[in-house]
Amino acid sequence: MVLFKCDGREMPRMNLSADNVRDSIPLFRNGGGGSIPTSAHQLLFVKTNVHRACELNALWHSRFPKIHWSNVVRNKDYICFVAEHDMMAYASAIWSSPIARNFENANTALELRRLAISKDAPKNTASRILGWMRRYLLKHFHHINLLISYQDTECHKGTIYKASGWNIASRSKGHKWTCRTRKRNKDQSISDKIRWQLCLR
């Protein structure tokens, strides 16, 4: 049996269906779900374990569905969130220390590695969870001064970041991660990227 830590306790992790991954109480509802929210204001934003966050990302992320939990927890800082209504998930977010080795001030920055929204999430879910996470990180991560995230220019226009007060920090050409000395998994995208950032302090 595989275990994961939740609020400091080791809990059993089961093989669940897609509906059950979304459900915080699958054993009681058996994936039946709850009422569907009609407004993003009805969503409750809470921390979640990295396994569930990665599984939700695999369900919903249009461009980067693959992210292994071990690539998250090996970082100095990491935290995952979920947006729920009636104990059903509608969005997930995965943060960690910046993955770029040469990133300046890496010890005082957090990177939004993934933000995935379900198709049935209410309008403005992304902007609501971005705002809530900013306030949470400002309050609980006292050593973090900067938030960053990378936009895939082939699929997204950065509207959500712009509307949430983030600024463009840099633009870069897409490239493969695999090199002669280090073989990687198949790239999910090699399109150009824009790095957005938000100063917390």
Predicted feature residues:
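Charged, low-complexity intrinsically disordered segments and flexible loops
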Residues: M1-T38
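Short amphipathic alpha-helix that is part of the acyltransferase structural core
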Residues: I25-S70
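Short beta-strand-to-coil "C-cap" segments at the C-terminal boundary of structured domains/repeats
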Residues: Q197-R201
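A short acidic/basic microdomain associated with nuclease active sites
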Residues: N71-V72, S149
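Acyl-donor binding region in acyl/amide transferases
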Residues: L44-K47, H85, A91-D192
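Extended mixed-charge, aromatic/glycine-enriched low-complexity segments
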Residues: N49, A53, H61, P65-K66, ...
